[in-house]
Each structure stands twice: as C-alpha cells, then as structure tokens.
UniProtKB/Swiss-Prot annotation:
This is 3-isopropylmalate dehydratase small subunit 1. Pfam families: Aconitase_C. The gene is leuD1. It comes from Salmonella typhimurium (strain LT2 / SGSC1412 / ATCC 700720). Keywords: Amino-acid biosynthesis, Branched-chain amino acid biosynthesis, Leucine biosynthesis, Lyase. One of its GO terms (cellular component) is 3-isopropylmalate dehydratase complex. Heterodimer of LeuC and LeuD. Pathway: Amino-acid biosynthesis; L-leucine biosynthesis; L-leucine from 3-methyl-2-oxobutanoate: step 2/4. Its EC number is 4.2.1.33. NCBIfam families: leuD (TIGR00171), PRK01641.1 (NF002458). Catalyzes the isomerization between 2-isopropylmalate and 3-isopropylmalate, via the formation of 2-isopropylmaleate.
Amino acid sequence: MAEKFTQHTGLVVPLDAANVDTDAIIPKQFLQKVTRTGFGAHLFNDWRFLDEKGQQPNPEFVLNFPEYQGASILLARENFGCGSSREHAPWALTDYGFKVVIAPSFADIFYGNSFNNQLLPVTLSDAQVDELFALVKANPGIKFEVDLEAQVVKAGDKTYSFKIDDFRRHCMLNGLDSIGLTLQHEDAIAAYENKQPAFMR
C-alpha cells in the first residue's frame, strides 16, 4: 500500500522555468540505483550545485534559498517533466520531499508516473499559475493547501479548482499503487489459480 493522499498543506517554492525536462530533474548519471530512495540528493543536480559531485550549492538556485528550505509544493511552468521517460524523475521529487507539483501542463508520461508514485500533479491555467507565482514571490514562505477530495488549491484568500480523473483520484485517496490495486483482487486471483491443473501452477 502506498501512502494515502487526501489533503496537504506545505511550503511552496517557485521554479520559474518552462519545459523542465527529466534530465534536469534527475541527470542520467544518477540513474544506476534500483531502489526509489536516495534520488532526492541529486534532484536538479546541475542547477542546485556548482560542481558535478553535488558538494557546492549554487546560491542563485531557488531551491537553495533559505526561505524555501523544507518546501513540499513545487510551482512550475508549462510542459513540466518533458524529455525522456524515466520514473526516476518523480522518485527524485518525492525523495526530496515534494508532495505536489502545480503547473499549467505536464508531459504525459511524467504525469502518469507521478500518480504511480503518490506525487500529485495539479494542472491550472496559465493565468492562474501566473497569479500563484506573483503571490509566492510577494510572500516568500507562503503555504498552500491542496485538497484532493475537494479538488481545490487554497492560496492566500483565493481558491483554485482543478480536475483529476476519477480513477487516479480514487487511487491516491486510498493509497493504491499498481501493487495495491492488484492485491484488491487477491482472493479472486487465488481462486483462479486453484482451479488450474497442477501442471499449470
């Protein structure tokens, strides 16, 4: 079972860049691991650090600003997660501590991979995202509330509605990843297997 996602309130960091691709999110040289943990240390590695080994933080990159330490909601621009298909991208984001990414649009494969890893991609209009960037920049350290049950983002004194398809919403609300969905049918699977001839088991 994955962690259930119903509502999250968190610090917002504004990444004011469009077409952020998966190689920027987690560069290819860090993809050797086969577990989901440890990728957060290399999130946005080429932007966060001045050296390849990730020892010298780049003071001009927004994730390194003191006021955004501990951020769990990433505010981004259009076509977030484009580029090559790698599930390591949402792994890196969640391992770093992100629960939500808000953007005007997402690359299709990244969008699907996010749900599989309990990272909520929230799509709002360009105008709404512009408003949120202005709000965050005027109020560094502001927190947003993201309510998946009600499908709204509460930011300052405004509320923004978003839409998630019913199946993905159900899975996140109930903490169901691909394994969890399969286990919901465990009894039926076992019954089917028991009906098979011995030579087929």
